[in-house]
Amino acid sequence: MSESVRTNTSIWSKGMLSVIVAQFLSAFGDNALLFATLALLKAQFYPDWSQPVLQMVFVGAYILFAPFVGQIADSFAKGRVMMVANGLKLAGAAGICLGVNPFVGYTLVGIGAAAYSPAKYGILGELTTGDKLVKANGLMEASTIAAILLGSVAGGVLADWHVIAALVACALAYAGAVAANLFIPKLVAARPGQSWRLSAMTRSFFSACVVLWRNGETRFSLVGTGLFWGAGVTLRFLLVLWVPVALGITDNATPTYLNAMVAVGIVVGAGAAAKLVTLETVSRCMPAGILIGVVVAIFSLQHALLPAYALLLLIGMLGGFFVVPLNALLQERGKKSVGAGNAIAVQNLGENSAMLLMLGLYSLAVLVGVPAVAIGIGFGVLFALAIAALWIWQRRQASY
């Protein structure tokens, strides 16, 4: 490791700021590209059920490459891994701009995102240490939330003006992320010299899966975070379908504004969880998870914009309070058992598998003609029941 990295572990170091800027631009591009590509599908008269399929090809890339991306992140300098991953995202977005099938281009973006995730979190521990690492994670999450808010809104607003302009803006964001990655110090690979045989890599990954699943706390965390993020991405697409039906608004911007309210709420809920929940009292977050489903069902019955905003803000607050303690639990327990990189890769597999399942069920419901309001109510009720079942299961496991 270079001397500059050894001595400068400040969260305001050049390397750390480069990581944060790259993360913001990359996440901005991800969120803007989703809504810009959805607008492109609408403009090209794709059926409604194809919208969640777009996200399914994205998360499918995460699942397919899950056994390998953790080792890739640990075998090379993580800053360079992030740069190559953002380059793949840039190629996918540029391809969509140039007329490549949007599903093909978005799959390439998904491959880049899969490779990017373990590297972006793993590099924080190489650039700083101790209490500063907690603050660095906070900066990373803050930049991500800001990118979700601004990227989602920018994608929808620009798409209402000009779809191709929105897609070009996404490509430029990814290009900026690649440029920012160039300023990250070239760190020594964490675990060089590992076997690149597919069978060995796959065995190593699934061995980590088994270790985490056999531990009651990490299993509880994996299921909880998987349910949450699966529900979260499904809600995004439900809003795109629900807004014109319930509110009579047909633009591309309104669903992005509503999604932004959820992101704002997550920030508030995450702050509350940091103050009120510890690793020893993680079960305090479970009532919030049940209430997410209840509020989603109530939200689905609304016909005015103001209560819709308020309820989505509440959903976000409940979500932040629910998921942050579960993430912390998995990171802490996983670091001690299989390593942080493997724990993140396994969590990504679980979350994206849940997304794929929920999006598949949602696509099927849309395909057979279930009304958007009915989908929302059923979705909320099922989510509340699933979290309640998880809570009961966790309490029984703890009593043994």
From Swiss-Prot:
- A Pfam match is MFS_1
Q: What is this protein called?
A: Lysophospholipid transporter LplT
Signal peptide (residue range): none
Matching entries from HAMAP family are given as: MFS_LplT
* InterPro entries assigned: LysoPLipid__transptr_LplT, MFS, MFS_trans_sf
The gene is lplT
- Sequence similarity: Belongs to the major facilitator superfamily. LplT (TC 2.A.1.42) family.
Q: Which GO terms describe its molecular function?
A: lysophospholipid:sodium symporter activity
What membrane topology is annotated for this entry?
Multi-pass membrane protein
Looking up NCBIfam families in the UniProt record yields: PRK11195.1
Q: Which residues cross the membrane?
A: 19-39, 53-73, 91-111, 139-159, 164-184, 195-213, 227-247, 257-277, 281-301, 304-324, 352-372, 373-393
Location in the cell reads:
Cell inner membrane
